[in-house]
Amino acid sequence: MPDQKDRILHFKSPLGDKRCAISALSGYERLNALYSFDITLLTELDPIAPQELLGEDVTVTITVADVERKLHGVVCEFDEVDPVGDNVFEYRAVVVPRLWLLGLNSHNRLFEGKDAVEIVKQVVKDSCGLAIETSNLKSYRRREICCQFGETDLEFVLRLLAEEGIAFYFKHTKSDCKLVLSGGMSGFENCDPVTYPYNERDSSAWKHRVSRFKRAGRLCSGKLVSTDYSEYAPASPLKVEAKSKASKKLRPGELAFHGGHDFELKGDRNLPNGDCKEQAKRWQHGLEADGAQYTGDSGAPSFTAGHKYELEDIPVSSGGEKQFLLTEVTHSATEGYDQESYYGNSFRCVACSDSMTFTPAPPRERPRVWGPQTAKVVEVKNPEISGAHAEVKVQFPWDEEHNSCWSRVAQLYAGNEWGGFFVPDIDQEVLVEYINGDPDRPVVVGAVYNEKNKIPPYTKWQSGIRTRSGDYNELRFDDNPGSEEVYFEAGKDHNFLVKNDEAGEIVRDQTLKVGADQKVDVGSNIEYESGQKINVKAGTEIVMEAGMSITLKVG
């Protein structure tokens, strides 16, 4: 193969410098997205097996007029192409960031007491080891619980960043690639060099210049309405709005979001309206990110998505703006083995503004869990101590390391200090549903028996309720034909209160057995009437006492 030393495209890999060389490159990089580059490799005599490069870290160097641009990544695809000549083999390799590997992992798990940035760092570290830098980030709310369910690690990370309005891009240094999380315009780095001339008439492809620069625009939604609800402030459902400052003609339409907020625990758990308003603003900025842009062409390989540059000889189409943030760059290069070498790119950018935050578009869909799941109760909140709702923590079989957040328990009905109240106990198996399918908002809707927790010793005709304590209380119904029965048992005491009258009818016999004393305290009269006889028997004595008189009448 030709020596790579004096070429505009250089390929560094575990194969060494002389095994193969690049003949062409094309690819793109975007702000808030993963980059991807297709490279064409040529080798002589010694074919390359896919396993030699798949999963390997490689570096592509683009050199134009003594300015180098590094592209680091991992090979995710490798295809053999038809030979281009005698003993010359051609291959196609796709190079992506190591963050791409997160798309190969999928987990069902819970994160407790962490903010979005902490979660992202942990997932990236565990999955691919890509270095992360943060720039101009603020503090983010700690989430009581954050659930990853049915998502790849990559989908999960991108969702968290979008929910918090955190922009990201990749920074390629001489030795490696880093993921940069940015919280505002000052969090984006400059291109190197930072200043580029504008000249449409110069046909040289090797100058670091902008050869085309035009305005571009898109219609986008001009208003975002976000609603939500928290059981800790049921009388004040959340509704926040964010509007564009542009004209309604350019920003028609309105997008409605519901249930997209993760409320932070703050004392009484009131809704953090200020935080939600800021989140709505960030989401609106994300919707407007593509509204007013510029497109162009250049011969500068140092143009990198997520980086800023300054334009000299400002064209009329710039509207007087001088500094711009690159949001998308598409690269193209060919190596001059049998043709003239070439490098060029096309790009999209926005004018830099301190008031602008180029955030990701809000996630249109959170992951959904449709249908119930089983879980085991691991903690029960005592309402006598906390004054809280009927709440439990559960552990899911797909995450034995963490417990869920405090989850409400659905009742038959619930009012203000009235309604049903049954709370499952520790080690019970329960069924969990999710409000609007959101895995971060579980609700316990029932309990089921299993091999460990067996049903009460009832027959097929019997049903009822048996509670758990040192002993138990029970209300049982027996529907065996001819032997129907309602059975009540108190584990210790039985107390009841009738605030007016009590009436009843016993068609046949009544038997009452009292193991110790019986006392009846009546505020007025007692009347007994028997159709035949009344027997009174005492083991030792009978004492009858009247304040005035005793009357005994016979016949």
Give the ranges of each region predicted by the language model:
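Extended, domain-scale alpha-helical bundle/helix-rich regions
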Residues: 84, 114-132, 138, 146-353
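Polar/acidic, low-complexity leader/linker segments enriched in S/T/G and N/D
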Residues: 1-20, 208-210, 360-363, 370, ...
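Short, basic/aromatic beta-hairpin or loop at an interaction surface
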Residues: 26-38, 272-290, 398-411
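Structural signature for extended repeat/solenoid scaffolds and their inter-repeat hinge/linker regions
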Residues: 170, 181, 309, 340, ...
